[in-house]
């Protein structure tokens, strides 16, 4: 890990092929300008698949604001979606998940405190892949693109889980 708290997270080099990188970069280029809307759709899909996941978010627990209109959810969703996509886009070039050390530790700690489990990460992965599939042109989506985004997501989750360990919290 970098002593200056910058961009190093995962231990050891990540294997992410040129083809995977190209698929992620091509699709992210299409989604980037609409990341606020797409990120919000990503979270709405999470709550559609797992309504109880709302309880994991302090700003949603006692809120009467519909998810579609909740400004805090919109801000959070965009930040998470952009971070996920940017980390995926950098994976091959850097050989690791590139999210600030302090951010990944905070994410790990927050996810640990809120009781996020492997099942929650799987729901989020499903929702992410479905959201990306809906956001890119149908002719672009392929099993290879799904695999590239899935692998990138898995690397990000592995980095977050490192921060979820009690010793790291």
Curated annotation (Swiss-Prot):
Catalytic activity: Fe(III)-heme b-[protein] + nitric oxide + H2O = Fe(II)-heme b-[protein] + nitrite + 2 H(+)
One annotated GO molecular function: oxygen carrier activity
Pfam families: Globin (PF00042)
PROSITE patterns for the chain: GLOBIN, PLANT_GLOBIN
Domain Globin: 15-165
Required cofactor(s): heme b
The UniProt record lists the keyword Metal-binding: yes
Positions that bind heme b: 58, 72, 76, 106, 110-111
Stretches of the chain forming a coiled coil according to its record: none
Subcellular location: Cytoplasm; Nucleus
InterPro entries attached to this UniProt entry: Globin (IPR000971), Globin-like_sf (IPR009050), Globin/Proto (IPR012292), Leghaemoglobin-like (IPR001032), Leghaemoglobin_Fe_BS (IPR019824)
EC number, UniProt record: 1.7.2.-
GO cellular component: cytoplasm; nucleus
Triggers of expression: Accumulates upon salt (NaCL), drought, cold and asbcisic acid (ABA) treatment. Induced in nutrient deficient conditions (e.g. Ca(2+) deprivation), but down-regulated in resupply conditions.
A GO BP annotation: response to abscisic acid
Entry's cofactor comment: Binds 1 heme group per subunit.
The protein's role, per its UniProt record: Phytoglobin that reduces nitrite to nitric oxide under anoxic conditions (e.g. during flooding or in waterlogged soil). May not function as an oxygen storage or transport protein. Has an unusually high affinity for O(2) through an hexacoordinate heme iron because of a very low dissociation constant.
Protein name per the record: Anaerobic nitrite reductase NSHB3
